[in-house]
C-alpha cells in the first residue's frame, strides 16, 4: 500500500511547487539515471508504472532487484544502477523500483527526507490514532524503503482511504488537490484500465472501485458510490495470476456489499 502513499506525497509536492509538473523529466531531479530512455522518463511515468525501468518484481529469486531492496544496505545505489530500457509512458509494468525512485525524487525536489515530508504534509493532517513508521535500508545510509515498508494499523489505513474517498479533503481541509486525487483514480493508459496513478482500479459489479494494495494481502478498498471503505490486513488467499486486482479483493467487496444491503 506504500505505493499509493508515495503517489499521494508526489501530488502534494506538485501542489506545493516542489515539482513543477507531472510531465517534468525525472532526470531534472535525479541527474545520474541510466539507460537509453533515462532522459525521457517523466515524473508521472514513475507513479503510473509506465517508466520503462528494467525490473523483475519476482521475490522468489534472491538476486532479483526487488528482493535486493529488502536486504541491501543502500537502496538508493541499487536504484541508480537500474537502467530505463523501454520508451516510457506507453506500457504498464509493475515495479517497486518506480516507487523507490519517486520518493527519492520528492526528497531531491523538496530537500526534505521522504518520511518527514509524508508525516508533515499528509499523515499528521488525518488525525491518526497511533504512530506509524517507515523502514530504513540501514542505519548508515538511512534511506526510506518507500517501495514497501510503511507500518500502521487498520483504523489509520482506513483514514488514508477516507482521504481518497473524499477527494483529498479531511474535516473540511483540502489536504491533497482534488483534481489530482480524481486523476489518480482514473486509468492512466487506454489499453490497461486496472491502474491509475499509484492506485489500483476495478469496475466489479459495475462499481468504480479504487484500492491500495499491499504485497501480502493488505488492502484499503474505496467504493465512492457506496461511500464505503473496506480495510483488510492479512495474508492473500487468492491470486488471479496476472496483472490487475487480485481475486480475493472481489470476495471482500462482495461480502461487504452483502452486509450493507442486508
Which residues does each predicted region cover?
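Active-site SXXK
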Residues: 1-22, 46, 102-106, 157-160
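Active-site helix/loop module of the DD-peptidase/beta-lactamase fold
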Residues: 16-54, 81-83, 110-147, 152
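Flexible glycine/proline-enriched surface loops and loop-helix/loop-strand junctions
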Residues: 60-61, 83-88, 98-100, 139-146
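Solvent-exposed loop and edge beta-strand segments that line ligand/cofactor-binding
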Residues: 87-94, 144-151, 212-213
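Active-site-proximal alpha-helical segments within enzyme catalytic domains
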Residues: 98-105, 146-169, 218-234
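Active-site Gly/Thr loop motif
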Residues: 130-131, 135, 181-231, 239
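Short, gly/Ser/Thr-rich active-site loops of penicillin-recognizing serine hydrolases
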Residues: 241-262
